[in-house]
Amino acid sequence: MKKTIEISKLSKSFPSPDGEETVHVFNEVDLVVEAGSSVAIVGPSGSGKSTLLNVIGLLDKPTQGSIEVNQQSLGSLSDKEVAEYRNQTVGFVFQSHHLLPSCTVLENVMVPALAGFGKLRGSELRNRATELLKEIGLDHRLSHLPGQISGGERQRVAVARALINNPSVLLADEPTGALDQSNSNKLIDLLNQLNEQKGVTLLMVTHSEHSANQMKHAYHLNDGNLNQQR
């Protein structure tokens, strides 16, 4: 079994607002994600799902424990290595798409590659962005602004943007949270399609049992503990 993500005894806590107590978000979490797999972490709002994903994505720091991604320890990376990791090793999809309103769909997809760490430039970058939009069925929207397309389409653009630098891991934080059931189903189908065709490892957090059931494996996070469901 080739491991993409390996987490050992990972914990996250922070002081309460009055500073008198310690709030434990999750406690000594262990998780192994196989390369090319799709995994859902499901749980109620406030259970720490997004915090766990942020820690894996190096958007937040753990209190203790270790994380390895592609057999690289994330505990001692330099600031430059952290930036490269966020931009190249992992791709992020959030509940809110955060598309730039004054940029076209095509330009939005290219943004991460233009941030300084992408390997493609010029026509090669444009061609890759166009191909990604074709794969998600939006190559007819290249010159549209985000406000000119539907909410479901905007979230699919966010998926294409997350893949522009060819990451090995896709981290999705409640990606269907702002969508109706029809568009939610379409987005989950798209994520599974990309997981199968591109071999990108998919780790998704969601409060939806229905969405979690579409992944190959599912874990439940509640009361600070992570338990495998299947």
Stretches with model-predicted labels:
Residues 1-2, 230:
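Short, Lys/Arg-enriched, disordered terminal segments
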Residues 4-5, 10-221:
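ABC family nucleotide-binding domain
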Residues 218-230:
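H-loop (His-switch) and adjacent beta-strand-loop-beta switch element
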